[in-house]
């Protein structure tokens, strides 16, 4: 069985999670994936490991993870793949950048055990899609 996990940044304010919940509901309504979960990078739950675990508990063997970010950044290229167990978790990054940021990542050390028979497919972020251009133009015209 296939699952889709939408991954967002998370925020101290509720809007980020509410948006992801709404998007997940809209995706569910299309009936393309039997399981749709959301996971948040930081500040709120469900965390990314919690979302993946929830999908596995429902019988998912193939988990497609879509980062709901416009562009690649440190979260999509490093933090999320690390949380998904796709890249080695070495702790040298704590020295890479000033520590004012990384104390927010209270989810970072949550360990995710992926069973042997479960495949994780990590996809690209939203990107410079023409459909985004349409939305930008609508917003510019106050629509």
From Swiss-Prot:
Keyword Lyase attributed: yes
Top-level taxon in the UniProt lineage: Archaea
GO MF entries: cobalt ion binding; nickel cation binding; sirohydrochlorin cobaltochelatase activity
GO terms (BP aspect): anaerobic cobalamin biosynthetic process; methanogenesis
EC numbers for this chain: 4.99.1.3, 4.99.1.11
Family label: Belongs to the CbiX family. CbiXS subfamily.
Entry protein name: Sirohydrochlorin cobaltochelatase
Source organism (scientific name): Methanocaldococcus jannaschii (strain ATCC 43067 / DSM 2661 / JAL-1 / JCM 10045 / NBRC 100440)
């Amino acid at each position: 069985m296939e699952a889709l996990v939408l991954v967002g940044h998370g925020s101290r304010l509720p809007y980020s999670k509410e948006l992801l919940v709404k998007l997940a509901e809209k995706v569910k309504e299309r009936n393309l994936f039997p399981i749709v979960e959301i996971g948040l990078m930081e500040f709120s739950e469900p965390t990314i490991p919690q979302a993946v675990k929830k999908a596995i508990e429902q019988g998912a063997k193939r988990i497609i993870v879509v980062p709901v970010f416009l562009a690649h950044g440190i979260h999509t290229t490093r933090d999320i793949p690390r949380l998904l167990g796709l890249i080695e978790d070495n702790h040298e990054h704590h020295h890479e950048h000033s520590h004012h940021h990384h104390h927010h990542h209270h989810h970072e050390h949550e360990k995710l055990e992926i069973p042997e028979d479960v495949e994780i497919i990590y996809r690209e972020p939203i990107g410079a899609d023409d459909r985004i251009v349409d939305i930008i133009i609508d917003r510019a015209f106050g629509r």
